[in-house]
């Protein structure tokens, strides 16, 4: 059984980011390492939703590059994607499902 591990501090950062970005969706890259069936989140890289949308999110190519460079510098990898659904249930939308196929890491939807 696989699981995701993150600290309360990182969880609080994600919740705060989601609240601050309302009414739009928020998003972040989750950096860490996978050991056996455990995805350990060591760093949350908060990103801007360039769509400025309540129903979609896009992370800019520049921010994606910054996130990957930070992961490399810290000897980590992308282990998850976070985004919020401020006006709907926290279940994957059809768009989410499509992009999950391109990014086969755990997705956390809040």
What label would you give each PLM region?
Residues 1-78, 87-110:
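Conserved beta-strand-loop surface patch within small alpha/beta domains used
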Residues 84:
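Short, well-ordered beta-to-alpha junction loops that form the rim of enzyme active sites
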């Amino acid at each position: 059984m696989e699981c995701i591990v993150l600290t309360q501090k990182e969880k609080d950062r994600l919740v705060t980011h989601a609240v601050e970005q309302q009414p739009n969706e928020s998003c972040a890259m989750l950096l860490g390492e996978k050991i056996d069936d455990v995805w350990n989140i060591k760093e949350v890289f908060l990103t801007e939703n360039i769509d400025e949308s309540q129903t979609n999110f896009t992370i800019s190519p520049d921010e994606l590059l910054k996130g990957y460079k930070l992961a490399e510098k810290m000897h980590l990898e992308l282990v998850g994607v976070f985004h919020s659904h401020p006006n709907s249930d926290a279940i994957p939308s059809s768009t989410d499902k499509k992009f999950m196929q391109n990014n086969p890491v755990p997705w956390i939807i809040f």
